[in-house]
Amino acid sequence: AHICKIGGYTHLETLSALKEAGMDSMPGAGAEILSDRVRRLISKGKCTGQEWLDIMKVAHKVGLTTSATMMFGHIETTEERFDHLVRIREVQAQKPEGENGFLAFIAWPFMDDGTLLQRVKGINNNTSADEYLRMVAISRIMLPNIKNIQTSWLTVGADTAQLTLHGGANDMGSIMIEENVVSAAGAPHRFTANSIQKCIKEAGFIPQLRTQLYEEREIPVMEEQLIDY
């Protein structure tokens, strides 16, 4: 949306040019909560919820695989959470035949540390493990046309992430070699390639390495370096 705005291009022109230049997928960040009431209060300067959805429709039309996200647990209502899921489901239902559209959905709780919402408005992250588990389970039920539901171990930690694997999630995501957004807002959790596999096994599942497009790959033998975060 920002490129379109400063360059004076349409969504189709922008995404077509990016694909021609080699881009084959696009993350679903920036969805936050799609309600414009919420967006006006927590993400001024970002596009409207409808424009976010429109951009995703065009991305799917030109053959780009994307993901969809939700950042909840701040000022949104329960109804706005459900509306968010319904609108994402509707966009996925409109994807061209043969295209992936949204390949995954990821919900994570608002991380409040050092944010303006916390300092100015006193909004804190009060999302419990039970509430996050319910959010993942509801996402699985309400998004039957999105194959993969990813848990956000980065924001909720290993123990809660393990529970979500039994409650609708089928993907732990990546180990995130570098992440500077939610970690700056109080998400301290970290995994290595071996420790994330151990976590999955302890939950009763078999780890599977995958590509961005969820193609299975053989897990190589790795020697890990200790990284001081």
Q: Could you say what each language-model-derived stretch is?
A:
Residues 1-64, 71-95, 120-127, 186-187:
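Conserved non-cysteine loop/helix-boundary elements of the Radical SAM core domain that shape
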Residues 27, 67-69, 171-175:
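Short hydrophobic alpha-helical runs that function as membrane-insertion/retention elements
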